[in-house]
Amino acid sequence: QSRSMAGIMSNSITDAMRANVTEARNGAYNGSTCDVSGEPGGSLADSDITAWVSSLKRAIGQSACGTVLCQAGQCDITVQWDDSRASAGSSSHLVTTRVQL
């Protein structure tokens, strides 16, 4: 179920990036974060990333983190989380989705 949610949540940030495509292509969404505190007065991209990671944590669990890397309009979106409770040990998972903007 977590893997499916990671794919769905990747689509969520992709939609936000397409709505702000110029900034996305310029790298405004690039980075990796587990932080949901956000910065007051930040950019639309910052707000989108904060909302996305908050949604990841609600859907997948508090260990969820997100990474976006866009270069020349091609973006890799990665969702990573630890599912050790479900697998009775350390179990780090990641799902990467590649999209063209």
Predicted regions and their residues:
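Flexible, low-complexity segments enriched in proline/glycine/serine and punctuated by aromatic residues
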Residues: 1-101
